[in-house]
Protein backbone atom coordinates (compact mmCIF):
# COMPACT_ATOMS: atom_id res chain seq x y z
CA UNK A 1 0.00 0.00 0.00
CA UNK A 2 1.12 3.57 -0.69
CA UNK A 3 0.33 4.40 2.94
CA UNK A 4 3.06 2.00 4.06
CA UNK A 5 5.48 4.79 3.17
CA UNK A 6 4.25 6.80 6.15
CA UNK A 7 3.22 4.09 8.64
CA UNK A 8 5.48 1.02 8.35
CA UNK A 9 8.77 0.34 10.08
CA UNK A 10 10.77 1.76 12.98
CA UNK A 11 11.78 4.80 10.96
CA UNK A 12 8.13 5.86 10.69
CA UNK A 13 7.57 5.96 14.46
CA UNK A 14 7.30 9.80 14.44
CA UNK A 15 4.74 9.66 11.63
CA UNK A 16 2.64 7.14 13.55
CA UNK A 17 2.85 9.26 16.68
CA UNK A 18 1.30 12.20 14.86
CA UNK A 19 -1.51 10.01 13.56
CA UNK A 20 -2.10 8.66 17.06
CA UNK A 21 -2.41 12.26 18.25
CA UNK A 22 -5.42 12.47 15.92
CA UNK A 23 -6.98 9.44 17.61
CA UNK A 24 -5.94 6.70 15.19
CA UNK A 25 -4.94 3.30 16.59
CA UNK A 26 -2.36 0.70 15.66
CA UNK A 27 -5.23 -1.34 14.21
CA UNK A 28 -6.28 1.61 12.01
CA UNK A 29 -2.78 1.75 10.58
CA UNK A 30 -3.00 -1.80 9.31
CA UNK A 31 -5.82 -0.82 6.95
CA UNK A 32 -5.88 1.10 3.64
CA UNK A 33 -5.77 4.87 4.15
CA UNK A 34 -8.69 6.53 2.35
CA UNK A 35 -8.77 10.29 1.84
CA UNK A 36 -12.30 11.71 2.02
CA UNK A 37 -12.18 14.97 0.09
CA UNK A 38 -14.98 17.20 1.33
CA UNK A 39 -15.90 20.63 -0.03
CA UNK A 40 -18.34 21.60 2.72
CA UNK A 41 -18.99 25.31 3.17
CA UNK A 42 -21.92 27.23 4.58
CA UNK A 43 -21.61 29.85 1.81
CA UNK A 44 -22.81 27.60 -1.01
CA UNK A 45 -26.22 25.84 -1.03
CA UNK A 46 -24.77 23.03 -3.10
CA UNK A 47 -22.32 22.26 -0.29
CA UNK A 48 -24.14 22.96 2.98
CA UNK A 49 -25.10 19.29 3.42
CA UNK A 50 -21.78 17.68 2.57
CA UNK A 51 -20.78 17.01 6.18
CA UNK A 52 -23.60 14.47 6.33
CA UNK A 53 -22.38 12.78 3.14
CA UNK A 54 -18.78 12.76 4.40
CA UNK A 55 -19.86 11.00 7.60
CA UNK A 56 -21.74 8.41 5.54
CA UNK A 57 -18.69 7.87 3.33
CA UNK A 58 -16.45 7.40 6.38
CA UNK A 59 -18.91 4.93 7.89
CA UNK A 60 -18.76 2.95 4.64
CA UNK A 61 -14.97 3.01 4.64
CA UNK A 62 -14.81 1.77 8.24
CA UNK A 63 -17.40 -0.94 7.59
CA UNK A 64 -15.34 -2.45 4.78
CA UNK A 65 -11.99 -2.39 6.54
CA UNK A 66 -10.50 0.97 5.61
CA UNK A 67 -9.33 3.98 7.62
CA UNK A 68 -10.81 7.30 6.44
CA UNK A 69 -9.16 10.73 6.73
CA UNK A 70 -11.23 13.79 5.87
CA UNK A 71 -9.86 17.01 4.42
CA UNK A 72 -11.39 19.97 2.61
CA UNK A 73 -11.05 22.00 -0.54
CA UNK A 74 -12.50 25.39 -1.40
CA UNK A 75 -15.79 25.73 -3.29
CA UNK A 76 -17.03 28.85 -5.08
CA UNK A 77 -20.73 29.42 -5.80
CA UNK A 78 -20.98 30.72 -9.36
CA UNK A 79 -24.42 32.17 -8.66
CA UNK A 80 -23.16 34.33 -5.80
CA UNK A 81 -20.01 35.24 -7.74
CA UNK A 82 -22.06 36.12 -10.84
CA UNK A 83 -22.09 39.59 -12.38
CA UNK A 84 -19.13 41.13 -10.53
CA UNK A 85 -15.37 40.78 -10.13
CA UNK A 86 -15.79 37.62 -8.08
CA UNK A 87 -16.71 35.64 -11.20
CA UNK A 88 -13.13 36.06 -12.43
CA UNK A 89 -12.10 33.59 -9.73
CA UNK A 90 -14.58 30.83 -10.55
CA UNK A 91 -12.86 28.98 -13.39
CA UNK A 92 -9.35 29.60 -11.98
CA UNK A 93 -10.49 27.99 -8.71
CA UNK A 94 -10.67 24.67 -10.59
CA UNK A 95 -6.87 24.60 -10.79
CA UNK A 96 -6.49 25.49 -7.09
CA UNK A 97 -8.79 22.60 -6.16
CA UNK A 98 -6.87 20.19 -8.40
CA UNK A 99 -3.57 21.27 -6.85
CA UNK A 100 -5.01 20.93 -3.33
CA UNK A 101 -6.24 17.37 -3.89
CA UNK A 102 -2.94 16.35 -5.46
CA UNK A 103 -0.93 17.97 -2.66
CA UNK A 104 -2.90 16.54 0.27
CA UNK A 105 -3.10 13.02 -1.14
CA UNK A 106 0.60 12.86 -2.02
CA UNK A 107 1.73 14.40 1.27
CA UNK A 108 -0.25 11.95 3.40
CA UNK A 109 0.15 8.75 1.41
CA UNK A 110 -3.49 7.93 0.78
CA UNK A 111 -4.22 4.63 -0.94
CA UNK A 112 -7.54 5.81 -2.37
CA UNK A 113 -9.89 8.79 -2.38
CA UNK A 114 -13.59 9.51 -2.17
CA UNK A 115 -14.32 12.91 -3.72
CA UNK A 116 -17.38 14.83 -2.47
CA UNK A 117 -18.02 17.84 -4.71
CA UNK A 118 -21.25 19.42 -5.91
CA UNK A 119 -20.86 22.67 -7.78
CA UNK A 120 -19.45 23.75 -11.10
CA UNK A 121 -15.65 23.86 -10.81
CA UNK A 122 -15.32 21.64 -7.77
CA UNK A 123 -16.34 18.48 -9.65
CA UNK A 124 -13.74 18.73 -12.44
CA UNK A 125 -11.13 20.24 -10.11
CA UNK A 126 -11.24 17.30 -7.72
CA UNK A 127 -11.18 14.76 -10.54
CA UNK A 128 -8.22 16.48 -12.21
CA UNK A 129 -6.22 16.43 -8.98
CA UNK A 130 -7.05 12.79 -8.27
CA UNK A 131 -6.08 11.75 -11.80
CA UNK A 132 -2.56 13.11 -11.31
CA UNK A 133 -2.09 10.50 -8.61
CA UNK A 134 -3.66 7.58 -10.49
CA UNK A 135 -4.81 5.99 -7.25
CA UNK A 136 -8.29 4.45 -6.96
CA UNK A 137 -11.03 7.03 -6.41
CA UNK A 138 -14.79 7.34 -6.54
CA UNK A 139 -16.95 10.46 -6.76
CA UNK A 140 -20.04 11.22 -4.67
CA UNK A 141 -21.62 14.33 -6.16
CA UNK A 142 -23.78 16.28 -3.71
CA UNK A 143 -26.98 16.19 -5.73
CA UNK A 144 -29.43 18.71 -7.20
CA UNK A 145 -31.69 21.13 -5.35
CA UNK A 146 -35.44 20.68 -5.56
CA UNK A 147 -37.26 23.48 -7.41
CA UNK A 148 -39.15 26.05 -5.37
CA UNK A 149 -42.83 26.81 -5.83
CA UNK A 150 -44.92 30.00 -5.77
CA UNK A 151 -48.61 30.29 -6.63
CA UNK A 152 -48.63 26.85 -8.24
CA UNK A 153 -45.61 27.48 -10.47
CA UNK A 154 -42.14 25.98 -10.04
CA UNK A 155 -39.07 28.21 -9.95
CA UNK A 156 -35.29 27.93 -9.70
CA UNK A 157 -32.32 30.31 -9.67
CA UNK A 158 -32.45 31.27 -13.35
CA UNK A 159 -36.01 32.50 -12.78
CA UNK A 160 -34.40 35.29 -10.74
CA UNK A 161 -31.74 36.23 -13.28
CA UNK A 162 -34.39 36.40 -16.01
CA UNK A 163 -36.77 38.07 -13.56
CA UNK A 164 -34.41 41.04 -13.33
CA UNK A 165 -34.81 41.55 -17.08
CA UNK A 166 -38.58 41.14 -16.80
CA UNK A 167 -38.67 43.76 -14.06
CA UNK A 168 -36.59 46.17 -16.18
CA UNK A 169 -39.20 46.14 -18.96
CA UNK A 170 -42.20 46.21 -16.61
CA UNK A 171 -43.33 42.60 -17.08
CA UNK A 172 -43.32 41.95 -13.33
CA UNK A 173 -43.37 44.17 -10.26
CA UNK A 174 -40.63 44.45 -7.64
CA UNK A 175 -42.98 42.71 -5.19
CA UNK A 176 -43.42 39.76 -7.58
CA UNK A 177 -39.66 39.56 -8.07
CA UNK A 178 -39.19 39.47 -4.28
CA UNK A 179 -41.72 36.64 -3.93
CA UNK A 180 -39.84 34.58 -6.53
CA UNK A 181 -36.56 35.42 -4.78
CA UNK A 182 -37.91 34.06 -1.50
CA UNK A 183 -39.00 30.69 -2.92
CA UNK A 184 -36.84 29.88 -5.96
CA UNK A 185 -33.94 28.21 -4.13
CA UNK A 186 -35.50 25.61 -1.86
CA UNK A 187 -32.48 24.46 0.15
CA UNK A 188 -29.45 22.20 -0.17
CA UNK A 189 -28.20 21.11 -3.57
CA UNK A 190 -26.97 22.36 -6.92
CA UNK A 191 -29.39 24.55 -8.89
CA UNK A 192 -32.42 22.59 -10.06
CA UNK A 193 -31.86 22.52 -13.84
CA UNK A 194 -29.26 21.00 -16.15
CA UNK A 195 -26.73 23.71 -15.45
CA UNK A 196 -22.98 23.19 -15.12
CA UNK A 197 -22.93 21.47 -11.71
CA UNK A 198 -25.59 18.93 -12.64
CA UNK A 199 -24.16 18.52 -16.14
CA UNK A 200 -20.78 17.62 -14.64
CA UNK A 201 -22.40 15.25 -12.13
CA UNK A 202 -24.15 13.46 -15.00
CA UNK A 203 -20.93 13.24 -16.99
CA UNK A 204 -19.02 11.98 -13.95
CA UNK A 205 -21.49 9.11 -13.70
CA UNK A 206 -21.29 8.58 -17.47
CA UNK A 207 -17.49 8.40 -17.22
CA UNK A 208 -17.93 5.54 -14.75
CA UNK A 209 -16.60 7.40 -11.70
CA UNK A 210 -19.82 7.40 -9.61
CA UNK A 211 -22.25 4.68 -8.60
CA UNK A 212 -25.45 4.40 -10.70
CA UNK A 213 -28.09 7.09 -9.99
CA UNK A 214 -25.61 9.22 -8.01
CA UNK A 215 -25.79 12.22 -10.36
CA UNK A 216 -29.53 12.78 -10.22
CA UNK A 217 -30.28 11.67 -6.66
CA UNK A 218 -31.19 14.91 -4.92
CA UNK A 219 -29.33 16.47 -2.01
CA UNK A 220 -32.23 16.04 0.43
CA UNK A 221 -32.97 12.42 -0.54
CA UNK A 222 -31.93 9.70 1.92
CA UNK A 223 -30.86 7.67 -1.10
CA UNK A 224 -27.97 10.13 -1.47
CA UNK A 225 -26.73 9.19 2.01
CA UNK A 226 -26.98 5.50 1.13
CA UNK A 227 -25.02 6.08 -2.09
CA UNK A 228 -22.37 7.89 -0.05
CA UNK A 229 -22.08 4.98 2.38
CA UNK A 230 -21.90 2.45 -0.46
CA UNK A 231 -19.23 4.58 -2.15
CA UNK A 232 -17.16 4.55 1.04
CA UNK A 233 -17.35 0.77 1.10
CA UNK A 234 -16.66 0.45 -2.62
CA UNK A 235 -13.45 2.50 -2.54
CA UNK A 236 -11.90 -0.06 -0.17
CA UNK A 237 -12.71 -2.76 -2.73
CA UNK A 238 -11.17 -0.68 -5.52
CA UNK A 239 -7.98 -0.21 -3.48
CA UNK A 240 -7.73 -3.92 -2.67
CA UNK A 241 -8.34 -4.82 -6.33
CA UNK A 242 -5.96 -2.04 -7.47
CA UNK A 243 -8.51 -0.68 -9.96
CA UNK A 244 -7.11 2.69 -10.95
CA UNK A 245 -8.93 5.54 -12.70
CA UNK A 246 -6.86 5.20 -15.83
CA UNK A 247 -8.19 1.62 -16.08
CA UNK A 248 -11.68 3.14 -16.32
CA UNK A 249 -11.10 6.43 -18.15
CA UNK A 250 -10.43 5.14 -21.64
CA UNK A 251 -11.08 7.12 -24.81
CA UNK A 252 -14.39 5.25 -25.08
CA UNK A 253 -15.40 6.32 -21.55
CA UNK A 254 -14.88 9.95 -22.49
CA UNK A 255 -16.89 9.40 -25.65
CA UNK A 256 -19.73 8.05 -23.49
CA UNK A 257 -19.65 11.18 -21.36
CA UNK A 258 -19.72 13.41 -24.42
CA UNK A 259 -22.58 11.43 -25.99
CA UNK A 260 -24.63 11.78 -22.79
CA UNK A 261 -23.77 15.48 -22.66
CA UNK A 262 -24.85 16.06 -26.26
CA UNK A 263 -28.03 14.01 -25.87
CA UNK A 264 -29.11 15.80 -22.70
CA UNK A 265 -28.05 19.26 -23.87
CA UNK A 266 -25.67 19.93 -20.99
CA UNK A 267 -23.82 23.10 -20.14
CA UNK A 268 -21.30 24.51 -22.63
CA UNK A 269 -18.82 24.52 -19.75
CA UNK A 270 -18.48 20.77 -20.21
CA UNK A 271 -16.45 21.53 -23.34
CA UNK A 272 -13.88 23.12 -21.02
CA UNK A 273 -13.96 20.56 -18.22
CA UNK A 274 -13.98 17.26 -20.12
CA UNK A 275 -10.86 18.15 -22.17
CA UNK A 276 -9.22 19.47 -18.98
CA UNK A 277 -9.91 16.20 -17.16
CA UNK A 278 -8.67 14.20 -20.15
CA UNK A 279 -5.55 16.35 -20.29
CA UNK A 280 -4.49 14.86 -16.95
CA UNK A 281 -4.28 11.49 -18.72
CA UNK A 282 -2.64 12.66 -21.92
CA UNK A 283 -2.22 16.00 -23.68
CA UNK A 284 -5.11 16.54 -26.12
CA UNK A 285 -6.57 13.12 -25.25
CA UNK A 286 -9.99 14.74 -25.81
CA UNK A 287 -10.49 17.98 -27.76
CA UNK A 288 -13.28 20.20 -29.02
CA UNK A 289 -13.11 18.23 -32.26
CA UNK A 290 -14.39 15.16 -30.39
CA UNK A 291 -17.52 17.09 -29.36
CA UNK A 292 -17.94 18.19 -32.97
CA UNK A 293 -17.51 14.64 -34.32
CA UNK A 294 -19.84 13.01 -31.80
CA UNK A 295 -22.54 15.67 -32.20
CA UNK A 296 -23.49 13.94 -35.45
CA UNK A 297 -24.16 10.63 -33.63
CA UNK A 298 -27.01 11.56 -31.26
CA UNK A 299 -30.05 13.86 -31.19
CA UNK A 300 -31.20 16.02 -28.27
CA UNK A 301 -33.47 13.75 -26.21
CA UNK A 302 -34.32 15.66 -23.00
CA UNK A 303 -36.08 18.99 -22.55
CA UNK A 304 -34.58 20.15 -19.25
CA UNK A 305 -34.15 23.64 -17.78
CA UNK A 306 -32.85 26.11 -18.89
CA UNK A 307 -33.83 25.22 -22.45
CA UNK A 308 -36.85 23.05 -21.62
CA UNK A 309 -39.68 22.52 -19.19
CA UNK A 310 -38.32 19.74 -16.97
CA UNK A 311 -36.19 19.91 -13.82
CA UNK A 312 -33.48 17.55 -12.56
CA UNK A 313 -36.02 15.83 -10.33
CA UNK A 314 -37.92 14.87 -13.48
CA UNK A 315 -34.76 13.40 -15.03
CA UNK A 316 -34.13 11.44 -11.84
CA UNK A 317 -37.67 10.08 -11.66
CA UNK A 318 -37.49 9.21 -15.37
CA UNK A 319 -34.60 6.82 -14.69
CA UNK A 320 -31.50 9.02 -14.41
CA UNK A 321 -28.26 8.36 -16.28
CA UNK A 322 -28.84 4.57 -16.45
CA UNK A 323 -32.02 5.29 -18.43
CA UNK A 324 -30.07 7.62 -20.72
CA UNK A 325 -27.56 4.79 -21.28
CA UNK A 326 -30.50 2.54 -22.15
CA UNK A 327 -31.99 4.96 -24.68
CA UNK A 328 -28.55 5.48 -26.24
CA UNK A 329 -27.50 1.82 -26.04
CA UNK A 330 -26.86 1.61 -29.79
CA UNK A 331 -24.28 4.39 -29.44
CA UNK A 332 -22.91 3.95 -25.91
CA UNK A 333 -19.56 2.18 -25.69
CA UNK A 334 -19.34 -0.73 -23.22
CA UNK A 335 -16.85 0.54 -20.64
CA UNK A 336 -15.98 -0.28 -17.04
CA UNK A 337 -17.26 1.71 -14.06
CA UNK A 338 -16.40 1.94 -10.36
CA UNK A 339 -19.56 -0.05 -9.61
CA UNK A 340 -17.98 -3.18 -11.08
CA UNK A 341 -20.59 -3.25 -13.84
CA UNK A 342 -20.11 -2.01 -17.38
CA UNK A 343 -22.17 0.80 -18.88
CA UNK A 344 -24.23 -1.56 -21.01
CA UNK A 345 -24.83 -3.87 -18.04
CA UNK A 346 -26.15 -0.84 -16.14
CA UNK A 347 -28.31 0.08 -19.14
CA UNK A 348 -29.70 -3.45 -19.36
CA UNK A 349 -30.78 -3.44 -15.70
CA UNK A 350 -33.04 -0.38 -16.15
CA UNK A 351 -36.63 -1.34 -15.32
CA UNK A 352 -38.44 1.95 -15.98
CA UNK A 353 -38.01 4.94 -18.30
CA UNK A 354 -40.36 7.90 -18.60
CA UNK A 355 -40.14 8.56 -22.33
CA UNK A 356 -41.90 11.91 -21.91
CA UNK A 357 -38.76 13.16 -20.15
CA UNK A 358 -36.04 11.00 -21.75
CA UNK A 359 -37.20 10.73 -25.34
CA UNK A 360 -36.49 7.84 -27.66
CA UNK A 361 -33.90 8.69 -30.30
CA UNK A 362 -36.50 8.27 -33.04
CA UNK A 363 -38.73 10.91 -31.38
CA UNK A 364 -36.23 13.46 -30.00
CA UNK A 365 -36.70 16.99 -28.71
CA UNK A 366 -34.44 18.18 -31.54
CA UNK A 367 -32.81 16.26 -34.38
CA UNK A 368 -29.50 17.98 -33.64
CA UNK A 369 -27.45 17.27 -30.51
CA UNK A 370 -27.86 19.71 -27.63
CA UNK A 371 -24.41 21.31 -28.10
CA UNK A 372 -22.83 22.57 -31.31
CA UNK A 373 -19.26 23.49 -32.19
CA UNK A 374 -18.97 26.33 -34.72
CA UNK A 375 -15.92 27.48 -36.67
CA UNK A 376 -15.16 30.34 -39.05
CA UNK A 377 -12.96 33.39 -39.39
CA UNK A 378 -14.12 34.69 -35.99
CA UNK A 379 -13.29 31.36 -34.32
CA UNK A 380 -10.84 29.29 -36.38
CA UNK A 381 -10.13 27.12 -33.32
CA UNK A 382 -13.81 26.79 -32.50
CA UNK A 383 -16.58 28.12 -30.28
CA UNK A 384 -19.62 26.54 -28.64
CA UNK A 385 -23.39 27.07 -28.49
CA UNK A 386 -26.04 25.24 -26.47
CA UNK A 387 -28.27 24.81 -29.52
CA UNK A 388 -30.77 22.79 -27.51
CA UNK A 389 -31.68 26.01 -25.68
CA UNK A 390 -31.97 28.17 -28.83
CA UNK A 391 -35.18 29.12 -30.62
CA UNK A 392 -34.96 27.37 -34.03
CA UNK A 393 -35.65 30.69 -35.79
CA UNK A 394 -32.21 31.82 -34.52
CA UNK A 395 -30.29 28.84 -35.89
CA UNK A 396 -29.37 31.18 -38.72
CA UNK A 397 -28.86 34.84 -37.95
CA UNK A 398 -27.19 37.78 -39.64
CA UNK A 399 -26.91 41.17 -38.03
CA UNK A 400 -24.79 44.19 -37.13
CA UNK A 401 -22.22 43.92 -34.35
CA UNK A 402 -22.58 45.89 -31.13
CA UNK A 403 -19.12 45.62 -29.59
CA UNK A 404 -18.19 45.81 -25.89
CA UNK A 405 -14.80 45.32 -24.24
CA UNK A 406 -16.27 43.95 -21.01
CA UNK A 407 -19.34 42.19 -19.66
CA UNK A 408 -20.15 45.20 -17.48
CA UNK A 409 -20.38 47.57 -20.46
CA UNK A 410 -22.64 45.11 -22.28
CA UNK A 411 -25.02 44.75 -19.32
CA UNK A 412 -25.34 48.53 -19.06
CA UNK A 413 -26.22 48.75 -22.76
CA UNK A 414 -28.75 45.90 -22.59
CA UNK A 415 -30.55 47.23 -19.52
CA UNK A 416 -30.29 50.76 -20.94
CA UNK A 417 -32.29 49.79 -24.02
CA UNK A 418 -29.41 50.24 -26.48
CA UNK A 419 -29.78 46.76 -28.01
CA UNK A 420 -32.42 46.27 -30.69
CA UNK A 421 -33.85 43.34 -32.63
CA UNK A 422 -31.35 41.90 -35.11
CA UNK A 423 -28.20 42.95 -33.25
CA UNK A 424 -25.26 40.67 -32.52
CA UNK A 425 -23.72 41.60 -29.17
CA UNK A 426 -19.94 41.05 -29.14
CA UNK A 427 -18.28 40.85 -25.69
CA UNK A 428 -14.51 40.50 -25.82
CA UNK A 429 -11.45 40.57 -23.55
CA UNK A 430 -13.33 38.19 -21.25
CA UNK A 431 -11.43 35.03 -22.24
CA UNK A 432 -9.28 32.85 -19.96
CA UNK A 433 -6.31 35.22 -20.19
CA UNK A 434 -8.07 38.48 -21.03
CA UNK A 435 -10.75 38.40 -18.34
CA UNK A 436 -8.82 37.06 -16.66
CA UNK A 437 -10.77 34.00 -15.62
CA UNK A 438 -13.33 33.75 -18.44
CA UNK A 439 -16.37 35.08 -16.59
CA UNK A 440 -19.80 33.55 -17.20
CA UNK A 441 -22.22 35.83 -19.03
CA UNK A 442 -25.41 34.81 -17.22
CA UNK A 443 -26.43 38.36 -16.36
CA UNK A 444 -26.47 39.66 -19.97
CA UNK A 445 -28.03 36.50 -21.40
CA UNK A 446 -30.73 36.42 -18.72
CA UNK A 447 -31.46 40.11 -19.27
CA UNK A 448 -31.85 39.46 -23.01
CA UNK A 449 -34.25 36.58 -22.31
CA UNK A 450 -36.16 38.48 -19.66
CA UNK A 451 -36.64 41.42 -22.04
CA UNK A 452 -37.95 39.10 -24.77
CA UNK A 453 -35.02 39.60 -27.15
CA UNK A 454 -33.72 36.02 -27.21
CA UNK A 455 -35.51 35.28 -30.49
CA UNK A 456 -33.97 38.26 -32.30
CA UNK A 457 -30.59 39.10 -30.69
CA UNK A 458 -27.45 36.92 -30.63
CA UNK A 459 -24.48 37.23 -28.27
CA UNK A 460 -20.94 36.08 -29.04
CA UNK A 461 -17.97 36.21 -26.68
CA UNK A 462 -14.52 34.87 -25.88
CA UNK A 463 -15.90 34.46 -22.36
CA UNK A 464 -18.24 31.68 -21.37
CA UNK A 465 -21.80 31.14 -20.24
CA UNK A 466 -23.51 29.77 -17.19
CA UNK A 467 -25.13 26.39 -17.61
CA UNK A 468 -28.29 28.39 -16.91
CA UNK A 469 -27.92 30.54 -20.02
CA UNK A 470 -30.31 30.03 -22.90
CA UNK A 471 -30.83 31.64 -26.27
CA UNK A 472 -28.41 32.24 -29.17
CA UNK A 473 -25.34 32.65 -26.97
CA UNK A 474 -22.05 31.59 -28.54
CA UNK A 475 -19.03 31.41 -26.25
CA UNK A 476 -15.43 30.19 -25.93
CA UNK A 477 -14.43 31.97 -29.17
CA UNK A 478 -10.86 30.87 -29.82
CA UNK A 479 -8.38 32.41 -30.14
CA UNK A 480 -9.53 35.02 -27.63
CA UNK A 481 -9.10 38.79 -28.05
CA UNK A 482 -6.17 38.93 -25.61
CA UNK A 483 -4.33 36.43 -27.83
CA UNK A 484 -4.92 38.57 -30.92
CA UNK A 485 -7.94 36.68 -32.18
CA UNK A 486 -10.15 38.23 -34.86
CA UNK A 487 -12.83 39.03 -32.28
CA UNK A 488 -10.46 41.79 -31.10
CA UNK A 489 -10.84 43.77 -34.35
CA UNK A 490 -14.58 43.48 -34.98
CA UNK A 491 -16.12 46.97 -35.13
CA UNK A 492 -19.61 48.26 -34.43
CA UNK A 493 -21.75 47.69 -37.50
CA UNK A 494 -19.72 44.83 -38.98
CA UNK A 495 -22.03 42.11 -40.26
CA UNK A 496 -21.87 38.84 -38.30
CA UNK A 497 -23.24 35.68 -39.95
CA UNK A 498 -24.16 32.70 -37.78
CA UNK A 499 -25.24 29.31 -39.13
CA UNK A 500 -25.64 26.82 -36.28
CA UNK A 501 -26.80 23.95 -38.47
CA UNK A 502 -23.91 24.54 -40.86
CA UNK A 503 -21.54 24.98 -37.86
CA UNK A 504 -20.26 28.34 -39.14
CA UNK A 505 -19.62 31.78 -37.66
CA UNK A 506 -18.04 34.58 -39.68
CA UNK A 507 -17.69 38.35 -39.87
CA UNK A 508 -18.26 39.69 -43.38
CA UNK A 509 -14.83 41.19 -44.01
CA UNK A 510 -12.44 40.49 -46.86
CA UNK A 511 -8.99 39.11 -46.14
CA UNK A 512 -7.28 42.41 -46.90
CA UNK A 513 -9.40 44.30 -44.37
CA UNK A 514 -8.86 41.60 -41.75
CA UNK A 515 -5.09 41.71 -42.29
CA UNK A 516 -5.00 45.51 -41.99
CA UNK A 517 -7.03 45.52 -38.79
CA UNK A 518 -4.92 42.81 -37.17
CA UNK A 519 -1.73 44.69 -38.08
CA UNK A 520 -2.95 47.81 -36.27
CA UNK A 521 -4.28 45.91 -33.23
CA UNK A 522 -2.83 46.94 -29.88
CA UNK A 523 -3.41 44.38 -27.15
CA UNK A 524 -4.35 46.16 -23.89
CA UNK A 525 -2.41 45.86 -20.67
CA UNK A 526 -3.50 42.98 -18.39
CA UNK A 527 -6.47 43.96 -16.23
CA UNK A 528 -4.95 42.32 -13.14
CA UNK A 529 -1.25 42.66 -12.33
CA UNK A 530 -0.96 41.09 -8.88
CA UNK A 531 -2.07 37.95 -7.08
CA UNK A 532 -3.38 34.64 -8.35
CA UNK A 533 -5.28 36.05 -11.33
CA UNK A 534 -2.11 37.68 -12.63
CA UNK A 535 -0.31 34.33 -12.60
CA UNK A 536 -3.36 32.60 -14.06
CA UNK A 537 -3.57 35.10 -16.93
CA UNK A 538 0.04 34.44 -17.90
CA UNK A 539 -0.17 30.64 -17.68
CA UNK A 540 -3.66 29.67 -18.87
CA UNK A 541 -4.22 28.00 -22.24
CA UNK A 542 -6.96 28.72 -24.75
CA UNK A 543 -10.61 27.76 -24.19
CA UNK A 544 -10.45 25.21 -27.01
CA UNK A 545 -7.72 23.44 -24.98
CA UNK A 546 -9.80 23.37 -21.78
CA UNK A 547 -8.29 26.55 -20.26
CA UNK A 548 -5.73 24.48 -18.34
CA UNK A 549 -2.54 25.92 -16.91
CA UNK A 550 0.51 25.42 -19.09
From Swiss-Prot:
Signal peptide: none annotated. The modification N6-carboxylysine is found at residue 121. Binds 1 [2Fe-2S] cluster per subunit. This cluster acts as a Lewis acid cofactor. The active site is at 466 (proton acceptor). Pathway: Amino-acid biosynthesis; L-isoleucine biosynthesis; L-isoleucine from 2-oxobutanoate: step 3/4; Amino-acid biosynthesis; L-valine biosynthesis; L-valine from pyruvate: step 3/4. Mg(2+) binds at residues 78, 120-121, 440. Its EC number is 4.2.1.9. Functions in the biosynthesis of branched-chain amino acids. Catalyzes the dehydration of (2R,3R)-2,3-dihydroxy-3-methylpentanoate (2,3-dihydroxy-3-methylvalerate) into 2-oxo-3-methylpentanoate (2-oxo-3-methylvalerate) and of (2R)-2,3-dihydroxy-3-methylbutanoate (2,3-dihydroxyisovalerate) into 2-oxo-3-methylbutanoate (2-oxoisovalerate), the penultimate precursor to L-isoleucine and L-valine, respectively. This is Dihydroxy-acid dehydratase.
Amino acid sequence: MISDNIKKGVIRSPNRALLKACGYTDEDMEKPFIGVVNSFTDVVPGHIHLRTLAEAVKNGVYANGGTPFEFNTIGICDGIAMGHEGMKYSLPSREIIADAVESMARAHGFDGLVLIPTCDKIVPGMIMGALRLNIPFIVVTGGPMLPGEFQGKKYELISLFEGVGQYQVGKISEEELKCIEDCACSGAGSCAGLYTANSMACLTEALGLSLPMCATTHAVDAQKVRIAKKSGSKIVDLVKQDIKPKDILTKEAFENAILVDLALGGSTNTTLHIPAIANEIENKFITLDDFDRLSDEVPHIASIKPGGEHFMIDLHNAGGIPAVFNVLKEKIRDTNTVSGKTTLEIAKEVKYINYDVIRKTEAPVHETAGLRVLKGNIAPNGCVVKIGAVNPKMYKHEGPAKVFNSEDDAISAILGGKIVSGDVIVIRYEGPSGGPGMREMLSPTSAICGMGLDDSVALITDGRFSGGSRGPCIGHISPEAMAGGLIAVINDGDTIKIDMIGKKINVELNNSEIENRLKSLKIPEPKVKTGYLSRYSRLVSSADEGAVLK
